[in-house]
Amino acid sequence: MLRGVLVWIRKVCNVCYNIGRHCVYVGQYTTNRNYGDALGVWLPKLLNINRGHILPRRFVFDWQYTRGTNIQMVGSTLGDVDEHSIVCGAGAVSSEQLPKAKPAKIVSVRGPLTRDIFLSQGMDCPAVYGDPAMLLPLFYTPINVKKRYKIGLIPHYVDKDAPGVRLLCQNPDIHLIDILLPPNRGLQTSIERYWKCWVDELCACECVISSSLHGLILAEAYHIPTLWATFSGNINGGAFKYMDYYKSINIITPPHINFCCKQDMDTSFLIEQTTLKDTSAIDKVRYKHLLESVL
């Protein structure tokens, strides 16, 4: 109740404070604790930190959002794209997901599969690829991090209680990293409070096994060997978004392991399956400057 009142007050303050200013809106209506999706709110702020008026969706009224510019940056948010959208690295969750309307501008998309969807709808889309979450090391990299865990396990939030995850967690060499951030406190979002702590935990792992796309993307951005895993059939869109991302860095057949079937859980075997991915197909510094020029 109190939180709802505080959010409403924040909305009113945003209306008053930003009269006459050009604002852009980011994120979904609900507060998203999924680390990857939450970066869709936080990264635009990092990219625009000294300049402007970027407001989270939850802190503006519906009439503001529907009239203003919205940024679709991180995550499978193609279905949220409308005529007021600027697409900066967003992707599709499946080949069936379509934009609501032709966006105001497409700067980049997550990968070539997302681009194909825009082209199939008769919308021009540049062959500029990259999930902006890959840029996080340009804003923060832990110094003198100690590798405390042999394997970091990052299941997608729908896989948290999957049998394969529970079995892996019995291995003392495996450290579970929750892709869901702690609950928000007041008006400060979890991503503001914990984004560096999550990266610290990630970088303390020698390698990473993940069914979360952003678990893979962020580990690879920090040059940690990874293995894409499947623990269930519950992830919306199946392999589509993973292949979209991997094709953006010129990996056509990424290593993959299916834990729905019985697999050898020996630590050395699992470590041998992880590989260090080359993400140099995307010039991160140049990509950062491109997104900054838009915001």
Per-region residue spans from a language model:
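Active-site anion-handling motifs in enzyme catalytic cores
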Residues: 1-295
